[in-house]
Amino acid sequence: METLTLAKVPGHTLGGMAIQVQTAEGKYVITGDMPHIAQSLFPQMNKMEVIGGEIVDITPAPENWGPFILNSVIYNHYACYDSFNKIMALAEAEDPKWFLTGHDMWCVNKRYFG
């Protein structure tokens, strides 16, 4: 059964929301701008897809930065970390493919999810 679940994810903004989308394939999470790119949730990523579909190498964040990289503008850092953990729990698995972020090019390049 395909369902939508809304979750409050404050931190970047007071009214931030994430949407869990249950599909036949599994549970995707539409994150909006919390986080705005997958590297925020997965700071050890070493590749990213750019517009047009090319995969490019990127430098992973230093491990001592912690489990997440926060957006540049955060109204509440504690709420932000709580929301990142909530977002991770909403997905099928802790893998970037399950997170549709607001500014990731692979989300623009892909035509169908689930």
Regions found by a protein language model. Give the residues of each.
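Core dinuclear metal-dependent hydrolase active-site scaffold
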Residues: 1-24
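Cap/insert and terminal regions of metallo-dependent hydrolase folds
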Residues: 25-114
